[in-house]
UniProtKB/Swiss-Prot annotation:
Broad class of the protein's primary localization: cytoplasm
GO biological process: DNA strand elongation involved in DNA replication; response to antibiotic
Molecular function terms from GO: 3'-5' exonuclease activity; DNA binding; DNA-directed DNA polymerase activity
Species of provenance: Streptomyces muensis
This protein's encoding gene: griR
Protein family membership: Belongs to the beta sliding clamp family.
Job description of the protein: A homolog of the beta sliding clamp protein encoded within the biosynthetic cluster for griselimycin synthesis. Upon expression in S.coelicolor A3(2), which is susceptible to this antibiotic, confers resistance to griselimycin. The beta sliding clamp confers DNA tethering and processivity to DNA polymerases and other proteins. Acts as a clamp, forming a ring around DNA (a reaction catalyzed by the clamp-loading complex) which diffuses in an ATP-independent manner freely and bidirectionally along dsDNA.
Family matches, as CDD domains: beta_clamp (cd00140)
Classification via PANTHER family: BETA SLIDING CLAMP, DNA POLYMERASE III SUBUNIT BETA
Protein name per its UniProtKB record: Beta sliding clamp homolog GriR
One CC-aspect GO term: cytoplasm
Keywords linked to the UniProt accession: Antibiotic resistance, Cytoplasm, DNA replication, DNA-binding, DNA-directed DNA polymerase, Nucleotidyltransferase, Transferase
Length: 373
């Protein structure tokens, strides 16, 4: 088995596949990446029984074949080699890597012990890659990282006719993003729960102009995604997220609007005096928003800015990190805050100007916290 591949091409491809490998696999063989060279294509595949990844790369194949190589080690090597073609020669159990004046000899892993990768399920529709990647990043930020509650580490993907709804929560905030997709056949309704980290990693790998094909197994336990030369399958999480339709308020007492960039900068400034897990108070009055951080006996900071308010004045406090996550993921220059009361949950949406209608396709619910003055 012998082939050549551009270093940059290999580094990008093996880097993506290797990220999907378990850091401490339950079975050592799962640390490997299957490398198949045939025709003018190099195919890299990884699998850990939960997630499978596959990418095709252009290569100059002199002798076809298949070998199992330690994935993370190959990724580390490809990352640091000079930017010239890399030559691979495989001789039984040894993999010889040559790049310019640098050479490595790697021990191949036993290919016959490697599990069979799952096939891509039946494609049920497609979505524009740019929109999908942005939507995933907007909701993934609120997914829990606590594996003690696996259901909260997922992103709910709801298919409702020609609308796809992504949603995630960590119990303290809830993000929803709606976007158009093209179902194959008769549009129907279904819901799946996908590991957030896996979905986000695939979204980050998308290239501009990619069309993402979405596939679901008939058993409803496997999701497949295919875009360009990349393919991924992952086992779905069991359970369901809370019903966001019941959590998001239907009626509000006040609506505040403020420029996103000014509020983000102000939050970062006043947060400098805060200890961990402290809150920032937002005092909305007609024409002004006042931010306060710190208590009477602590370091304090205040920032004022122009804002609009419809309805009752609001004096409310939030975790500043949660606010920043919501604000920085708005694709808008203005943020609209919809309040139920000074002690109730708030909903943040983007808008193009102070007088424009809010964009309801991206909604961010955040719970208030107590502020000690």
């Amino acid at each position: 088995m012998r082939f050549q591949v551009e270093r940059e091409v290999l580094a990008e491809g093996i880097g993506w596949v290797a990220r999907g490998l378990a850091v401490r696999p339950s079975v050592p063989i799962l640390s490997g990446v299957v490398v198949n060279a045939e025709g003018d294509t190099l195919t890299l595949s990884g699998f850990d029984y939960e997630v499978s990844t596959r990418v095709e790369l252009k290569a100059n194949v002199e002798e076809s074949g298949t070998v199992l190589i330690p994935g993370r080690r190959l990724a580390d090597i490809a990352k640091v080699l000079p930017d010239v073609p890399i030559e691979f020669n495989v001789d039984q159990t040894k993999v010889y890597v040559q790049c310019d004046s640098n050479s490595f000899v790697l021990n191949a892993l036993p290919l016959d012990e490697y599990p069979t990768l799952p096939k891509l399920p039946t494609v049920c529709g497609s979505v524009e890659g740019d929109q999908f990647a942005r939507a995933v990043s907007q909701v993934a930020v609120v997914a829990s990282r606590d594996d003690a509650l696996p259901v909260l580490t997922g992103i709910g993907v709801n298919f409702d006719g020609e609308i796809m709804k992504l949603n995630a929560t960590d119990r303290y905030r809830f993000a929803i993003r709606e976007l158009a997709w093209k179902p194959e056949g008769t549009p129907s309704s279904s819901s799946v729960l996908v590991p957030a980290r896996t979905l986000l990693d695939f979204a980050k790998s998308l290239n501009k102009g990619d069309l993402v094909k979405i596939a679901l197994s008939d058993e409803g336990n496997l999701l497949g995604l295919h875009a360009g030369t990349r393919q991924m399958t992952c086992r779905l999480l069991e359970g369901t997220l809370p019903d966001y339709e019941k959590l998001f308020p239907k009626e509000f007492t006040s609506f505040g609007a403020v420029e996103v960039s000014r509020l983000v900068e102000a939050l970062k400034r006043v947060s400098l005096v805060l200890e961990r897990n402290s809150s920032v108070a937002l005092d909305f009055t007609d024409g002004e928003l006042v931010l306060q951080a710190g208590g009477a006996d602590d370091d304090r900071a205040t920032s004022r800015m122009a804002a609009s308010l419809e309805g009752e004045s609001i004096d409310i406090a939030f975790n500043p990190s949660f606010l920043l996550d919501g604000l920085t993921n708005l694709d808008a220059s203005w943020a609209q805050f919809s309040f139920t009361s000074s002690n109730g949950k708030a909903v943040i949406m983007g808008k193009s100007s102070v007088d424009a209608e809010a964009d309801t396709s991206a909604r961010y619910l955040v719970m208030p916290v107590r502020f000690h003055r």
